[in-house]
Amino acid sequence: LQFAAMDGLLPLAEHMDYRVARTYIIDKAEQRKLKMPEALRRWALTDEERNIRINYIKPFMIPQEGRDILELNLDYVSKIADDVQARGYKLGPAGVFSKNTTDGKFAPYFPERAWLVPLAFAILAGGIMYLTLLFNFSKKIQYMLLLTGGIVASVTLLKFGGILTRQLLALIAATVFPVLSMTVIVELWESCKKNTPNTLKIIISATWQLALAVILSLIGASFVAAVLGDSRFFLEIDIYKGVKLTFILPVLLISLWYMQRFNVLSKGQIGNIAVHLKNFFSTRITVKHVAFLGVLAFVAYIFVGRSGHTAGVPVPALEIKMRLFLEQMMYARPREKEFMIGHPAFYLAA
């Protein structure tokens, strides 16, 4: 699902005191490429997954399936209504986000700015924990960094509302806490290195380790939800910025930590991350390095291009069919990168 800016959208929402509902529309240019059954499946699924309350349906302007335009569009709208109601929704006036009030009247939800201050300190503490793993900061430096960063964040949040600050804090939480989670897991693997011939024991061990990694990562997810929790973000007038960075940064951050922790490319030297990076950039490049980087660049292109709020790498037809199968077979379709690549790789590493 992509996001398109609309002229006048923000002033209109503010003028309405955020008494507005989320709307979904299939882009006109995209709809020209779709057959009716393919467009049909999007509506109810999007309503459920994206909390949509208004479906803005544009008619097909070219006959399909041997039917004229009127018959095609009447059937199209009728089936959309049936699919939406089959998922438990009711047709009628759209509901809007509102906080509970004593008089029962509508009011947009905006938390007290002071509540964001402890969140900012907690998120920054996670970032400083990671930096300490790389640079071995003393307790004094850690406290100084936390105090300085916390004061700056608090001032922007309390005085200006700090939308950009909140988005930056959310980015830190979304990238750093999964990395901290994996550092715990890798240290756990290092502490219990032994040959376990029993396949069942390996699977059980890897399963609870994966569960631990998920739980630790959910700490960061909880911070993201808390720091971006208000009507503007619920309605996606403001959105989480940095989706592609959220894919790239954890890989880079865990790689830097791994180089530091296991003295990769250190040539026998025990030093901080600066030593490892200096040795890395002094490495002599060979043809096999270029070939490896080419493969890595292609993988990165697919990995990053398939993320974000905007169009990127096209999805193959086979994968679209697999998605449809998973949507029908499971309550919620899992992310392919997770259950086809990430989770199997975790079990192999464990």
Q: What do the predicted segments below correspond to?
A:
Residues 90-146:
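Cytosolic-side membrane-insertion boundary helix
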Residues 123-350:
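Alpha-helical transmembrane segments of integral membrane proteins
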Residues 1-113:
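Soluble extramembrane regions of membrane proteins in the secretory/endomembrane system
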